[in-house]
Regions:
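Hydrophobic membrane-insertion alpha-helices, especially the h-region
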Residues: 13-30
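Conserved alpha/beta-hydrolase
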Residues: 89-109
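Short beta-strand/loop motif that positions the catalytic acidic residue
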Residues: 173-175
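Active-site glycine-rich loops that stabilize anionic/oxyanionic intermediates
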Residues: 76-80, 177-178
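Alpha/beta-hydrolase active-site loop
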Residues: 84, 105-131
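C-terminal catalytic-base region of ester-bond hydrolases, centering on the histidine
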Residues: 178-214
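Gly/Ala-rich beta-loop-alpha elbow adjacent to hydrolase catalytic centers
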Residues: 133-141
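Short beta-strand element of the alpha/beta-hydrolase
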Residues: 69-77
Length: 214
């Protein structure tokens, strides 16, 4: 009985320790993801205008003023509120493209890499799909394009680089000259555009980002 009691106490202490460790990890994770970049007023104004814009769950759809069969799916950067990219997407919308912004779980595209599949299924009238993303969103968009090359017509990377084997010939890569960490990872030359004086955070309206050069 004594031996059984000893093992019982040890097992209880072990289980308690594991539970506490899990609780600490969960608390740390939720603290990490709750500290994200918020969209600035200029971005929220686009949403508030209601001009050719509609929110459907985790999707924000910006539609051109006339019918189109071409759309861009956009994955936001890590820990950035999706609405921060609305000014950029609104400009694309005005060129005649449907733009579909995906708000990611916990503001991290890594948790829903294949979100584009669900988007495509919801819009059967769209015949030509492009997938785009900023920073981590670009990396995850690149992964999706690499795994589903027959489903997308092209890939657009902002402050990001190709991840996977999607062809550079079908990819547009745009980065700022002050974003050296991205430039160092670009080992291809096709369709690469450098914005002089540009920084990592300037693709969205969410303020300065830690690590950006002045």
């Amino acid at each position: 009985m004594q031996i059984t009691a000893v093992f019982h106490r040890k097992g209880l202490r072990l289980a308690t320790g594991v539970l506490l460790a899990m609780l600490l990890l969960a608390a740390g994770f939720f603290w990490y993801v709750s500290d994200y970049y918020r969209a600035e007023d200029a971005a929220l104004d686009v949403l508030a205008s209601g001009e050719n814009i509609e929110v459907q769950g985790s999707l924000t759809i910006l539609s051109p003023s006339y019918p189109t069969d071409t759309a861009i799916i956009f994955y936001p950067g890590a820990k950035v509120e999706g609405a921060a990219y609305l000014p950029l997407l609104d400009q694309l919308r005005r060129t005649g493209l449907t733009c579909i912004l995906v708000e990611m779980p916990f503001y991290l595209a890594i948790f829903d890499v294949n979100a584009a599949e669900d988007v495509m299924a919801q819009f059967p009238d769209i015949q030509h799909w492009y997938i785009a993303g900023h920073s981590m969103g670009g990396v995850m968009a690149s992964q999706f394009a690499s795994e589903h090359p027959d489903e997308v017509d092209g890939l657009i990377l902002l402050g990001a680089y190709l991840y996977g084997d999607y062809p550079p010939a079908d990819t547009l890569t745009v980065y700022g000259s002050l974003n050296q960490s991205v430039e160092d990872e670009i080992d291809y030359t096709e369709n690469v555009v450098e914005i002089q004086g540009g920084n990592h955070a300037q693709f969205g309206n969410y303020g300065p980002q830690k690590g950006d050069l002045p």
